[in-house]
């Protein structure tokens, strides 16, 4: 995802396609300009159809480690525009199961409607299950359930859409994630910028941390992590 102020004339130069309420308050907006789509909140770009490098890299790094696993179970927090999901499916084998938890129902509806061409049929892949649910609750559904959990939720450890998402990244949230991972499991987290405090929380929770900095597709932007 990209969390930045919409450049130029802002959203005034974009055509609104739809809005979707965020549970707990606020709304997401789906807007279009020519062939480019954005999902935005409060004038801030959350994700765009023309910039997806860090989302794909999140899946490549985590799921690449599962390439030889016979039947991995992967949880993706946040559907977005499907870039993480598509990248995961490209790496994982035919017996994999990928569950995507998306809190905002409109995002799922857009994936099957005006953004269907962006998703390129990945929601119909038999390995995929979409749950309209808080990924935090899915994580709490049972111990040693997942071989990998990929979180591209909100703005990473610094919430933008909903402060409730901070629960994923605080100490208790990380402990729950570790509890729900199988032995040797991986937690992949998208972040808009490096965060030493979050890295320290991961380490205190028992995770071995490797940080990957991905160059932003916009010149001059802070690398994504």
Enumerate the predicted regions with their spans.
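Active-site capping/gating segments
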Residues: 7-16, 20-23, 193-225
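Active-site-flanking structural segment that lines cofactor/substrate pockets
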Residues: 31-67
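Loop/helix-junction capping segments adjacent to catalytic residues or to phosphate/diphosphate-binding pockets
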Residues: 48, 82, 196
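The AdoMet/dcAdoMet-binding core of the Class I SAM-like
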Residues: 52-181, 189-192, 205, 210-216, ...
